[in-house]
Amino acid sequence: MNRIIFCTFFKKKSEGQDFQSYPGKLGKKIYDQISKKAWEKWIEKQTILINEENLNMFNLEHRKKIEKYMKLFLFKK
């Protein structure tokens, strides 16, 4: 059975993610408030950002930058 949540990205009830895809408290918030479709949109945007800004996910500063972008993308609409 699909998990239905109120997606804060789309501002409507939507199918939730199957599992917590990001660690920690932020991951829990994403799992509880961001739909599967919204998370897919973020993954697409993340890929674009990594490529455009030539980010290296082994670099801690670059990972922090992506996390900042993720928070803005998912929660500041």
Swiss-Prot record:
Disulfide bonds: none
GO CC terms in record: cytosol
Molecular function terms from GO: iron ion binding
Taxonomy, superkingdom: Bacteria
GO biological process: cellular response to oxidative stress
Stored InterPro entries: Fe_traffick_prot_YggX, Fe_traffick_prot_YggX_sf
Pfam families linked: Iron_traffic
Function comment: Could be a mediator in iron transactions between iron acquisition and iron-requiring processes, such as synthesis and/or repair of Fe-S clusters in biosynthetic enzymes.
Entry similarity comment: Belongs to the Fe(2+)-trafficking protein family.
Quaternary data: Monomer.
HAMAP family linked: Fe_traffic_YggX
Name of this chain's protein: Probable Fe(2+)-trafficking protein
Organism: Buchnera aphidicola subsp. Acyrthosiphon pisum (strain APS) (Acyrthosiphon pisum symbiotic bacterium)
